[in-house]
Amino acid sequence: MDQFIQLVEASQVRNDLPDIHPGDTVKLQLKVIEGEKERLQAFEGVIISDKGMGTSKTITVRKISNGVGVERIIPLCSPNIESITVLRKGKTRRAKLSYLRKRTGKAALKVKERKVFTPSK
């Protein structure tokens, strides 16, 4: 039975998403259905946590909107995710960045940037 569950989950895991970690600043394009119309809604913020694995993996994205902190928990295998773009890689020593909730203003989104090395030819 356990092998059957793993087989079904393996077929539903999305492979088109980038490698993301807590501290990264991302821009999500989410499908929103209003009545019979469907549109894309952008949500840009810092990933403060990720949880789970496989089809049950979720991320929590936090942004400051008009001085108010807004968090969204997004399942990564959701068909409502159109795309995820990594705007900035963050350097953190924690898996959960809940300390960002206490900060206000620009400091609420401030995470050191991680240097990404690319091999030279």
UniProtKB/Swiss-Prot annotation:
<dbReference type="InterPro" id="IPR038657">
    <property type="entry name" value="Ribosomal_bL19_sf"/>
</dbReference>
<keyword id="KW-0689">Ribosomal protein</keyword>
<dbReference type="InterPro" id="IPR001857">
    <property type="entry name" value="Ribosomal_bL19"/>
</dbReference>
<dbReference type="Pfam" id="PF01245">
    <property type="entry name" value="Ribosomal_L19"/>
</dbReference>
<dbReference type="InterPro" id="IPR018257">
    <property type="entry name" value="Ribosomal_bL19_CS"/>
</dbReference>
<comment type="function">
    <text>This protein is located at the 30S-50S ribosomal subunit interface and may play a role in the structure and function of the aminoacyl-tRNA binding site.</text>
</comment>
<dbReference type="GO" id="GO:0022625">
    <property type="term" value="C:cytosolic large ribosomal subunit"/>
</dbReference>
<dbReference type="GO" id="GO:0003735">
    <property type="term" value="F:structural constituent of ribosome"/>
</dbReference>
<dbReference type="GO" id="GO:0006412">
    <property type="term" value="P:translation"/>
</dbReference>
<dbReference type="InterPro" id="IPR008991">
    <property type="entry name" value="Translation_prot_SH3-like_sf"/>
</dbReference>
<protein>
    <recommendedName>
        <fullName>Large ribosomal subunit protein bL19</fullName>
    </recommendedName>
</protein>
<comment type="similarity">
    <text>Belongs to the bacterial ribosomal protein bL19 family.</text>
</comment>
<keyword id="KW-0687">Ribonucleoprotein</keyword>
